[in-house]
Amino acid sequence: MDNEAALSHLVGARISAGRAALALSLDQLATRTGVSRAMISRIERGEVHASAVVLDKICAGLGIALSNLFARAAESPLLRRADQPVWRDPQSSYLRREVAPTGTGSAVHIVEVEFPAGAEVTLGPAEHRVIEQHVWLLEGQMQITLGPTIHTLNLGDCLHMHPDRAGITFRNPGALPARYAVILTLKAS
């Protein structure tokens, strides 16, 4: 099984476990999220590589952060680059790498994102999942829309936000890919 298939199965298992923990049927989760029952079922079985937008809706319905879907049990406080979970959004082709070891009890998650030129992704409010988030631009240019405000980030800029208050749109207006770090502080489950 390749990394993408393994990660799809991990994501599916996490969604299924989250749904079971809340004693939700597929129909109930579909109603909460606006994602079809059939799509949720296919994701849970690892048959579909869902987009960030779809996974974000499911996470909102489960009350968890997107990072929780990719987290692995901590085996060490050191997570080598070769072992970091990597996921590619099938819609926008952005690449998401979980940089920090998960399962350590830390409320902080660090994600590296490679965002293609011209790509755009809109995620809903993080509601009760994320307390705060920083986006630190390492390469390229990004526009981040939070509510009615558009923030243009250039090399080295860092944006602090509370994503529970409004949806977020990530857009790369440049001709080159952008790379940035996202530092999330998650609420305790």
Q: Model segments located where?
A:
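Short acidic-glycine-tyrosine-enriched beta hairpin
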Residues: 147-162
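Recognition helix of helix-turn-helix/homeodomain-like DNA-binding domains
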Residues: 35-48
